[in-house]
Amino acid sequence: MMMNPRGFGIKRFKRSINNDSLTKFINDNRNIESSTVFQGNLYEYTVMRELESKLNVINMMKIGGSNDGGIDLVGDWPLRTIYEKMNLILKLDGNKIPSISKINGRTIKPIYNSILKGNLDTMDLKILVQCKAFSSSKVSPKELRELVGAYSTHCNRPSDKNKTIVMMCSPNLLTSKGLELINSVKIPLIYLRVSLIKNLNKEYDIENSGKLLNYYENSYTSELLQNLGVKEWLKLGLYNADLNSRNNVK
C-alpha cells in the first residue's frame, strides 16, 4: 500500500523552480526548433531537470559532443539526503542486509552497510547519463551494449565501479530483450523513462510534460542501493517534500 506523504508534515513546492534552463534554451533557439539537434538538446535539458528535481542529482553538466564517449550528461548523486529523509519515515537503520551480494559473478558490497559503520562518503556517487530522444522507437539491446562500453571507458579503474552509476534515459519503455540485457550486465545501470516536452500550439508545455515516468534499477544497482530508500522516495513523491526536521514527522 502506498503511504500518504501528507501524514508527515510535507510542504509542496512548485515544479517551475527547475524550468529556467529549459525556458532559456527554447527561447534562444526558436529558429532551429524543427531540427534534430534542437530536439536532442531539449530532451537533455528535460532529463537534467527531472534528475535534479526528483533524484536530487547535483552539479549536472552537458558534455555531449564528438568526444563524449557516448555520454551526454554527468553529475553527482549525494544519496545521503534521500536516505536520511526516508529513514525518518521507514526507520531504515533498523534493517539488516547481507554484507556481500553476488550478481552475474560480480561481488557487490551494499552501500547501506558502510553507512552503518559511519562511512557516509560511500553515498556520494557519480552518474553518467545517455539520452535517447526517440519519439516512437525503443532503446535497442545494441544501444544498451554501447552504453555499457561507454561506462567501461569512463570507469576503467576497479575503484570506480561501485562509485559510478550509468543511466539511460528515453521516452519509451524497454523491450523484453533490453530488460533482460541490462539485468545481465556487470555494472550498475538505471533505466529512466522520461517523456518528451509537448509542443502545443507552438508553445512548449514545460510544466505538464517532460516528466519522469518510470525508474528501473538493474539487478546490480538494486543490490548496491538496497535499503537506501530511493524507490520509496520516488513512489511517495517525496522529492516535493520538506522533511528537514524530525519535528515534521507526525
Swiss-Prot record:
Subcellular localization, as worded in the UniProt entry: Mitochondrion
Sorted UniProt keywords: Mitochondrion
Record bears the keyword Heme: no
Pfam families (UniProt xref): RRG7
InterPro entries named among the record's database cross-references: RRG7 (IPR018828), tRNA_endonuc-like_dom_sf (IPR011856)
GO molecular function: nucleic acid binding
Main localization category: mitochondrion
Top-level taxonomic group: Eukaryota
A cellular component term, taken from the record's GO annotations: mitochondrion
Family, similarity comment: Belongs to the RRG7 family.
Name of the protein in its database record: Required for respiratory growth protein 7, mitochondrial
Gene name of the encoded protein: RRG7
